[in-house]
Each structure stands twice: as structure tokens, then as C-alpha cells.
Design a protein with these regions (language model features):
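Catalytic machinery of carbohydrate-active enzymes
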Residues: 1-314
Length: 314
């Protein structure tokens, strides 16, 4: 059960049989009818386990309504006893120093259904026909996969997580000067940022157009390396087993960094300059300014050197 924007992720997981989408795009009587229909479908399935990964009230109500054999969530400081008593088991409250992959698996550990000490790797299933379609698209735009292919994801809905346009343009120019093909990916909302990067780069990258989340996952799967800001792209690359460089600013990479696979986290620290001793601060930019100096002052060559090292190119 998920929000509409998360549905494509579960569609790419071959272990998921049914996906129930929360009808938050509806309103009025249509929303009520959609929820009733959703509850009927869930009740009909007689699920044995309900694992609720957020502190949303819908999970507590579902647990009481469906009465599964096992229900579990995590402790939520802002919820009261009614919410907490809706579940048979409770995992510990979120920890800001542990990977989220581990903390999600804590729910299964709390029920004794998962006994391993390390969480499994992310996994998505990319079908051969999707790869074939993507390779045809690349060939149509002059990329034959005989050179190394790097995919860049530069944009975020939270601008304090972004590096300057000029930084990305310099990274692209350096990579392409070494005969590395570069594709800049992103959603429709990212197109303005991507166009600015394209305009600023001397050696032009290929931009994705109207790509779905599945298209993007497939692109990552055929790439040799993904370079991304702190975003879902980090985890999408990990899930398709492609090496990833994840560039972090205010966010704590101990929580949200890549999980398993081959990766490198780049983030400025006190070792680079005293002014970066505050990172990660967890703020929306320096003093709430929506601009993060730990990203603004990131040297392009620092990213390029790491990329060449991971691609084994010198």
C-alpha cells in the first residue's frame, strides 16, 4: 500500500503481488468511495502481516480494521497510546545515525521474522525488453555503449540539496573530454535545471525527455556509473546494482547514504575547511537560507576524480 508516486517502484519488484494505491488525488464522495473499495480489497485478502513504516494514522486504523495475525510499526513520539496499542509489535524510534535500510528491517526484527544482523540489498527487476528499448533510444541519440556511460541526476525538489549549475557543467565537460558519454536524467519537474546545465556545458550531454521512473531505472541499469545528489536516485542506482557517487550536503549520509553495492559518498567536512565542520547540519541551507555552502563550494574536480577512479579511467 503506497502513495501514487511510489507505485512504479513496487511494480519493478517481482516479489510484490498486489499494489494498493492511497487515493489522495481524489476528493469528496469519490475519495470516500475509493477508500471503502480499498478497504474491501484488503479485507478480502486476509493478510497475515501488516508492517507500517510511517506514523500515518491510516496504518493504525488498518491494523484495527483488518486484524492481521501480526502487526508492527515503530515507536512514534508524537503519537499517543491509542496509536501505539494498534500494533502487536513496535520497533525502536528512528535513529539518526543508522542506515534507513537497517531501520526499516527493524520492523521485521521486532516480530522475529528477520533474524540476520544486516539488512538485505535493495533489489529491482529490470526486464530485458525495457533494456532493449532503452538501448535503442541511446543509439538513436548517438550513444553506442562502446564508451563508458555516466548518468547524472542533479536536481532536487529541495534546492538546498543542489550544487550550482556551473559545477555540473564543469563535471560534464571533464567527463566528455575523456570520451565518456553523459546523460542527465530527471523528472518533468527537473527539466528547467537540466536545460540550464545543458546550456552551460561546453560539451553537450544528452538529456532525458518525459522518462518514467521505470525508464530512469532502466537507464541506470545500463550505465557504468550514476552521479547524483542526495536523492532517491542514490537508492535507485543501488537497487539496479550500478555503482553510484552520492553527493551529500546538509543531510546525514549515515541515514540516507547508498546501501550495499559499489558506491562512494562525497561530502565536505572539517578536513576540507573549518567552515564545513557543521556538516551534516540537517538544515534547509546555511541558517535556513535554502543555500548550502558545503555544496556551493564543492570542487568539480573532486567529483570527477572519484568518477574516473570508479570507472578505472586515468
Amino acid at each position: 500500500m503506497c502513495f501514487p508516486e511510489s507505485e512504479p517502484i513496487f511494480q519493478m519488484n517481482k516479489r510484490v503481488r498486489h499494489i494498493f494505491v492511497i487515493p489522495r488525488d481524489k476528493s469528496g464522495i469519490k475519495k470516500i468511495v475509493a477508500y471503502l473499495d480499498l478497504f474491501k480489497h484488503l479485507f478480502r485478502e486476509h493478510y497475515d502481516l501488516l508492517a507500517h513504516f510511517s506514523n500515518d494514522w491510516r496504518g493504525a486504523m488498518l491494523s484495527r480494521f483488518l486484524r492481521p495475525d501480526i502487526s508492527v510499526s515503530r515507536q512514534a513520539p508524537r503519537r499517543g497510546s491509542f496509536w501505539h496499542h494498534s500494533f502487536h509489535f513496535l520497533a525502536p524510534v528512528l535513529d539518526h545515525e543508522r542506515p534507513m535500510a537497517e531501520q526499516d528491517v527493524d520492523l521485521l526484527r521486532a516480530t522475529n521474522l528477520y533474524k540476520k544482523t544486516v539488512a538485505p540489498a535493495y533489489e529491482l527487476d529490470i526486464k530485458p525488453k525495457e533494456k532493449n528499448k532503452l538501448e535503442i533510444w541511446l543509439q538513436k541519440h548517438g550513444i553506442q555503449l562502446k564508451h563508458k556511460l555516466v548518468v547524472i541526476h542533479a536536481s532536487s525538489r529541495w534546492k538546498f540539496k543542489e550544487m550550482p549549475i556551473s559545477t555540473w557543467a564543469k563535471i560534464i565537460d571533464e567527463l566528455k573530454s575523456k570520451k565518456i558519454d553523459v546523460v542527465v536524467s530527471g523528472s518533468y519537474e527537473d527539466s528547467q535545471t537540466n536545460q540550464l546545465i545543458y546550456k552551460d556545458a561546453q560539451l553537450k550531454p544528452l538529456l532525458t525527455q518525459n522518462f518514467t521512473l521505470q525508464d530512469t531505472a532502466t537507464l541506470y541499469a545500463v550505465a557504468d556509473l550514476v552521479i547524483t545528489i542526495d536523492s532517491m536516485s542514490t537508492h535507485l542506482a543501488s537497487a539496479v546494482k550500478t555503482p553510484v557517487i552520492s553527493i551529500f550536503g546538509p543531510t546525514n549520509e549515515k541515514n540516507w547514504g547508498p546501501w550495499k553495492g559499489k558506491y562512494k559518498v562525497i561530502g565536505l567536512s572539517k578536513e576540507d575547511a573549518e567552515m564545513f565542520a557543521c556538516r551534516p547540519c540537517g538544515l534547509d541551507g546555511c541558517e535556513g537560507s535554502k543555500v548550502s555552502q558545503c555544496l556551493v563550494q564543492m570542487e568539480p574536480q573532486k567529483v570527477v576524480d572519484q568518477a574516473l577512479d570508479m570507472l578505472q579511467i586515468r
